[in-house]
């Protein structure tokens, strides 16, 4: 088990303080995950750039796709930064280098810079996709187009770019100096601007709409409310003098969880309730869904809101016990009770998923009267998705088709008819990705196992490295289709 925390601050993650192998598993495991994220990110970017439907210009793409696109580009630049830090930490632990050892001329603050240069864009990597999801959900249940589409798209891009300029507000207490503190104070305030643009455009989408408060819509609206709380507490970090009081306290825990649970998790739940019918052909129970939402809403506020007060009363993060004289008992008990409430809400969600998948109401191809292309095919979709490539005439393409049919007095088109899958060209499967994954695992095992005999330990890594080379070479030279398909 890694005993340096998820942040692995040096020098606590170095050998003298974390002598078991947990940190090796942590650092090498993260490097493997980084390779996975990089490959998946390239796949998303290439697909979005090259394989859009006819008429699907960039400014007609769903906002969710836009946000996924921005996130993959962020990952492409963020992963190398944390990879450098992980490689240096691994070399310190396995080969005796001294990147983060102060007594030998290393600098533990260097780890904090590398970690947070990656870590703060990572926050936006986590929150931008749910922002895209609710930007697709809100119009469907407000029955009107997304207000300010270009502003929502470009504010998402701005958040991604500005996310690189705020990392050191996590480090105001390490002695950066007044100029650096002033710069990061300003950038931390400025990033609230594109975030506010999104919120006001979401509110504009709801304004005057014929709103249906289905479960997906409740989670989307809950996302907005909780993210506002998390965003406001985040802007307070920009005030360096008060941040000295907040730094590394439960106030930071409260802020982070209002953003990542009240924001990202509620947004993901909204997407699940919205697209589950498309994926499975079954509707989730609205009664259970609304119960799930309200218990989650109560539970997350009971869990995380008291942490603001605990932090401002001096309770530091990363502790497992405290003296009763501090007076933190009651709020911690309330927070723990809130966690139990959250746990109950998750049980309701899991039960809803299982029950609805087995015996839920048939969804049909378009249960929400939604505007997106995915609702023009059957639920669940066939393996080939679209039997014919749709031609996109504008944003909200299915609404355009449906409203034109109504205006002309015609029947609203149903889902695309099913065809024999053998008549549709599909990409061929490849075994090289799994081969490369296993090879990377062998390479990692060679570094992590505790065998004092070097001629047993290191050849495992060498073999793994050679297999990785073979896998990547074969994978990159594999044709996209079999020879018979050309």
Predicted ranges, named:
Residues 1-486:
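Membrane-embedded and interfacial regions of multi-pass energy-transducing membrane proteins
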